[in-house]
Amino acid sequence: MDKKEDTKFKANPYNFNNVSISEEQVINIMKKLNITDFQLNNIEFYKTAFIHKSYCKLKDYEEYEYPGQPCLPLQETSYETMEFLGDAILGSVVSSYLYERFYKIHKQNEGFLTKLKIRIICGESLCKLSKCLSLQNYLVISKHIEDNCEGRSNSNILEDVFEAMIGAIYLDTNYKIAEQFIIRVIENYFDFTETLLIDNNYKDQISRYFQRVFDDGSRPIYKHIKKDDIFYCELYHKDKLLISGEGGSKKKSEQDVSKKALIYFNVLT
């Protein structure tokens, strides 16, 4: 864990760049996707969907005085529960969508569908989809995250808020609208042709690399640490630590560290 990560919940969090998403902005996102039967009921769901834990009321922040308006005050709740809900809905909708589109019509097998699903819901794809919707503009993050941890370009946070946005839509409306949102985003912004040509299952790639390079049959070893609701993952070759990664879940942290390992071995650039 690097020094930046160790201090991100200790530095002064107040960030004048934060702006909560408005009703008009939520409605415009849905209009952009041509979801005409959307009716916004409670803007608080959507505001919460963009609140990173670094901007919540934490014990380590008690020494810092709120600077007043127009700076947003620290928040009570982060997006993490909505992210959990959105992640489950996303997986269900994508599975059904791929079944209807690629099995019923083209008779593609389970292996093909699984591979495609993994690529749609991987962190890299969700980060890109967040950017397509300009969700980074509505992030509520600490000044430390803004200045030192890639801020509004942080791929892990953008991945999280895409899932949290799905959770917010579901809680505010219903499953049908959340499903429409996911499908419209996929059909508008997801390049299936490019995806089928690119292998971004980094954990699988590093496993194949180990099999090819190391004659002793050794496999990558993953060790996990959870701190402040972030999953950190270390990748070892035998007893040697190669690289560290992180993510919003155990699976995401494994993909992150696997990608970094491929860069470490000059497989990726």
Q: What does each of the following model-derived ranges do?
A:
Residues 1-269:
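Double-stranded RNA-binding/processing signature
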